[in-house]
Amino acid sequence: MFATPLRQLSSLKRSGIAGQEQAQLYEITNKGYGKDAVKVMHINRKGPVHSIQELEVGTHLKLYSNKDYMLGNNSDVVATDSQKNTVYLLAKKHGIESPEKFALILAKHFLSTYAHVEEVHVHVEAYPWQRMTQDVSDNIGKGYCENNCNSRSNGNCQLHNHAFIFTPTAHDYCDVILTRQDPKQTVISGIKGLRVLKTTQSSFVNFVDDEFRTLADQYDRIFSTVVECSWEYSDTESVNFLHAWETVKDIVVRNFAGDPSVGIPSPSVQHTLYLSEKQVLDVLPQVSVVSMTMPNKHYFNFDTKPFQQLVPGENNEVFIPTDKPHGTIYAQLSRKSLKSHL
């Protein structure tokens, strides 16, 4: 990371007691290496109905020895190119059922294959492919089916056997950390990029009123955010990871939007965030802790008062989207007496 070394290597003592004494002044307190952004696509071709998983994988290893750093000895180093090949070979051997299960397969492989590896960290991001749906009636152009049908057919709406559509509503990711000396499997799943907006049923009033305040009470405002949510499992054996991810996403959306007809009041971003986290822990007993971040994406009312001759009356229809600066609200909710890596 430095453009030039602070001292030339030739000026340092390379051997002898003085060099050993200097080395003992310092210790490596954190380390690791790996391969990032390994892209892999797996197609399950069993039967006429195909399924796909496209992932971006990162594998990082921590070795017991420091000799690769301190001595330039690479005898324990599993090359990052070998780690890349491992991703493809294990995808071929085991398939990819979910990001979490594949990450566990990779992490267990590195620990069981290389005795000199102390810890493995696997990060996986899934590309949001969804099975395509089509209206099989003759009414082309008069209606459509949304691509979230849960059954093989729904009236005139039919799920395609082998065609998919990219639907980046939200991104699925996970982190798996396995340590040789710790029997606990750390599995963290997450959602990011879930952008939502509602035009009413949001307020923000009765906050601190002092000499720094200029914002008036907001009794009815636009509420928009880009949700990032992560959760850690205390039980990884009995959980259906794909179902759990969809459940968390549904909980977040429902607590934000409420009933389709009447909505749900949101007195603050904090309260909406808390309700979502609480329901995640209520519904998913395998989850020990959940963390959420909800930046407040502002939409400010355009002031039409100076233009009453052109557009008379009040304005509650035209707003100015403002990305920066923005508020950021976050919280972590845990079951009592449980620790996490979030």
Swiss-Prot record:
Binding site residues for urate: 80-81, 204, 221, 269-270, 296
Record's keyword annotation contains Cell cycle: no
Tissue: Malpighian tubules.
Motif Microbody targeting signal per UniProt: ranges: 340-342
Keyword tags: Oxidoreductase, Peroxisome, Purine metabolism
Enzyme Commission code: 1.7.3.3
Annotated compartments: Peroxisome
UniProt KW Glycoprotein keyword: no
Catalytic activity: urate + O2 + H2O = 5-hydroxyisourate + H2O2
Record text on activity regulation: Repressed by 20-hydroxyecdysone.
Enzyme class: oxidoreductase
Family annotation (Gene3D superfamilies): Urate Oxidase
GO biological process: purine nucleobase catabolic process; urate catabolic process
One Pfam family named in its UniProt record: Uricase
Active site annotation, chain numbering: 35, 80, 298
GO molecular function: urate oxidase activity
Function statement: Catalyzes the oxidation of uric acid to 5-hydroxyisourate, which is further processed to form (S)-allantoin.
PANTHER family on file: URICASE
Similarity comment: Belongs to the uricase family.
NCBIfam families: urate_oxi (TIGR03383)
UniProt protein name: Uricase
Gene of this entry: Uro
